Each structure stands twice: as structure tokens, then as C-alpha cells.
Amino acid sequence: MTVEGRVVLITGAAGGIGKVLCKMFTELGDRVAGIDIVDPSKVQDAALALQADVSKADQIETAIEKVIQTLGPIDVLINNAGLADDTPFEQLSHESWDHDVSLVLRGNYLTQRYVIPHMAKQGKGGSIVNIGSVNGHIYLGSPAYSAAKAGLENLTKALAVRYGPLGIRVNVCAPGTIWSPAWDERFKKHPDVGDRMKRWYPVGRLGTPEDVARAVIFLADSKNSFITGTTLYVDGGLLAGNPCLIQDIYSENNNFVF
């Protein structure tokens, strides 16, 4: 793994995946700047912690300028901020729709809008990893979140093509279900939901923040300079096929072992 003492900017840095991203990039020897909407004290393992709402242009522009002034030019941007409202579509308020789309899609647009010119100016390229989701490919609830994640994939492709000649790579890491603190309340209310969800994954388990972080580190590595405009799925085989359906289809076949 290439370690260059890079400046790595991570949004959503106080969440389950964000905390692990900060920790693992710091362990690589990188200087990490963590941005989150919550109090900066919640951001751990970062050389610089800032509070900002990524969907607010003035806040994110100010935060990015602070990162550059304090740590230097940004080499790696990881857009990890996001939130999903699982309200059924017919009950979803306009405000909730706007909030999810603004946070996931507009937030990613804004961070890249302000970081890419700096990357281009420094003349040595850079790597951007947008945290997508399998929700951007199949419907698993959260319609606004799903629509925004699908849009993020096309934005990623557009930016990869536009800025590839400048050595700026843009990719998506799309996780499946990741067992993080965000799921704690749901698991408390429905203790069996975790086991039921595992049945949908060919590998027989849910993902961890570490699974996602390792994939992001791979995409961010400058050694992988021929990888851009693509999506790396960290989904335990979820999009490859449905083991529950297969099991039902072949349930009467004694020769089928699953």
C-alpha cells in the first residue's frame, strides 16, 4: 500500500464507517481531516476535526479552505456523509425527500466542486472515493436515498471522465448492509432482524466498517492509477444473486446443498 503522508479529507467522520476510515488512514501515516455535522469532539483519530453541513455551500467551502490552510493540499477526498429515511414513498414528506437528496447528492457535489479545483491546481492529481450503496442499484427501501445514490454513481462517472487527464481519479465504493452504530436502535427493537438479513447475503454475514475502509484504501491508493469511473461493491455478494430465492426453488432437490 502506498503511504505518502497524504492529506485525506473524510466527511461523515463521526459515524460508524467514518470513524474507522479516520483510524485506518491515520494508521497508514496519512494526515486526516474529519468533517461532520456533529460536534468536532465526536471525530476521532484525525489531525483536524471540523464541524460543517456538507449540503451547505458556505460551510463546506470554509471547511475545505481550513483543511488546506492547516494540513496542506488535499490528496484524497472520501465522501462518506449520508443518511436514509426509510419512510414509505407514499408517506414521505417533501422536506424529507429534499433532505436526503441534498445530503447525499448535493453534499457530494459540493465537496467535489470545491476540492477538485485545488487538486487540479497542485498538479499531481488525486483520488476521490464516493461512498455509494447497493440501494443505488436495487430497491431496498429509502426511495430518496436510493435515488440520490444512483445519481451519485453517474456524477462519479462524469467527473472521472472530465478530470482523468489531470490525474484525478473518481470512484464509488458501494457497501451492502454494514453493521454499525446506526443499526443499533433497529436491532434493539427487532433482535432477530440481523439474522434474517444475513440470509440474503451469499457470504452469510453482514459487512463491517472495516470491510468498507479496506476497499476505500484500495481505491485511494495511487498505485491503482488505472482505476477510475467505476464502482467497487462491498456487498457480500448481495447483487450477484438471491440465496433465499435459490433455496426456495431447489428446496425439494435433495442433491442441492446450500
Curated annotation (Swiss-Prot):
GO cellular component terms, semicolon-separated: cytosol; nucleus
Disulfide bonds: none
Enzyme Commission number, as recorded: 1.-.-.-
Domain of life: Eukaryota
GO molecular function: 3-oxoacyl-[acyl-carrier-protein] reductase (NADPH) activity
Compartment(s): Cytoplasm; Nucleus
One GO-annotated biological process of the protein: lipoate biosynthetic process
Active-site residue numbers: 145, 149
InterPro entries: NAD(P)-bd_dom_sf, SDR_fam
Keywords (A to Z) from UniProt: Cytoplasm, NADP, Nucleus, Oxidoreductase
Binding annotation for NADP(+): 17, 53, 80, 113, 145, 149, 178, 180
The keyword NAD belongs to this UniProt entry's keyword annotation: no
Coiled-coil regions listed in the entry: none
Enzyme class, UniProt record, top EC level: oxidoreductase
Keyword NADP attributed: yes
Family of the protein in this entry: Belongs to the short-chain dehydrogenases/reductases (SDR) family.
Name of the protein: Uncharacterized oxidoreductase C922.06
